[in-house]
Amino acid sequence: MYAVIQTGGKQYRVQPGDKVKVESLDAEAGQEVAFEKVLLIQSDDGVKIGQPFVSGGKVTGTVVAHGRHPKIRIIKFRRRKHHMKQAGHRQNYTEVQINEISA
């Protein structure tokens, strides 16, 4: 059984027991979170595809930790002008352990 959920502007394919790094959520470590925006659920009964979301579909999980992704470097050059601009960015994330998928 698996599902496709939408959170933080991205889509994730999840199964019970998976650990997923999603965009930062307002939840403490150990707290349960529910994802209501379920796009697809595949189970033994068949596939349920939402238009856009599966009605009654829900994925629950537990927040494991909060963290930050590795730094990415942004560099802009102006050719032949001896000009360079550097910046860096680290995106926050929340790691979630998927517990249950229900339709």
Swiss-Prot record:
Keywords: Ribonucleoprotein, Ribosomal protein, RNA-binding, rRNA-binding. SUPFAM superfamilies: L21p-like. Pfam families: Ribosomal_L21p (PF00829). One of its GO terms (biological process) is translation. GO terms for cellular component: cytoplasm; ribonucleoprotein complex; ribosome. It comes from the Bacteria. InterPro entries: bL21-like, bL21-like_sf, Ribosomal_bL21, Ribosomal_bL21_CS. The keyword Ribosomal protein applies. PANTHER family: 50S RIBOSOMAL PROTEIN L21, LARGE RIBOSOMAL SUBUNIT PROTEIN BL21M. HAMAP family: Ribosomal_bL21. NCBIfam families: L21 (TIGR00061). Part of the 50S ribosomal subunit. Contacts protein L20. This protein binds to 23S rRNA in the presence of protein L20. Belongs to the bacterial ribosomal protein bL21 family. This is Large ribosomal subunit protein bL21. It comes from Methylococcus capsulatus (strain ATCC 33009 / NCIMB 11132 / Bath).
